[in-house]
A protein has these predicted regions:
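Conserved AMP-binding/adenylation subdomain of ANL enzymes
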Residues: 1-8, 16-58, 68, 72
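Hydrophobic alpha-helical segments typical of transmembrane helices
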Residues: 11, 46-47, 65, 97, ...
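Residues at the C-termini of beta-strands that transition into short coil/loop
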Residues: 13, 19, 32, 39, ...
Length: 148
């Protein structure tokens, strides 16, 4: 994700799961970044407000969270121009969702992974998607990392 001390992570996944705790908290602790928890429970409207009000540069969530975030009306004055990266975990990311993340949330780079609940710090699958360096055809080429 190319985090730096200047990044601000919006982390709606719960801290009682590896995603929120390991991929959320440890990402900011190891890079000196800032973390925003938009609410006690997942609320897509609260996430949109956090992205805009806190000028978040990264967003974590599962595909269904991103679908919910994209499915609610944007608040007045919504600005996601700082948002660039994040992690989408728990399931593969459908191509239509990829396009919407690029077009509607300005997420020009993100990491897709799953297997964190079983492997914590070790990912069974990871794919970093960066645009505009690759076409959508090339986006679907996956890199597999195996633990031996």
């Amino acid at each position: 994700m190319d985090f730096s001390p200047f990044d601000i992570l919006c982390c709606p996944p719960p801290l009682f799961h590896c995603f929120g705790l390991v991929l959320g908290m440890l990402a900011v602790v190891t890079h000196g970044s800032k973390i925003i928890f938009p609410g006690e429970t997942f609320d897509p409207k609260a996430v949109l407000h956090a992205i805009s009000d806190e000028k978040c540069t990264a967003l974590h969530g599962v595909p269904t969270m991103f679908e919910a975030i994209l499915g609610v009306p944007k608040p007045e004055g919504f600005d996601c121009s700082n948002l660039r990266t994040g992690i989408i975990a728990g399931a593969p990311v459908p191509r239509p969702l990829m396009k919407r993340l690029f077009g509607e949330l300005n997420m020009t780079e993100y990491t897709s992974s799953y297997g964190t609940a079983w492997n914590a710090m070790f990912h069974v699958f990871m794919l970093t998607v960066v645009r505009p360096h690759r076409s959508f055809t090339n986006l679907l080429q996956r890199r597999h990392y195996r633990l031996h």
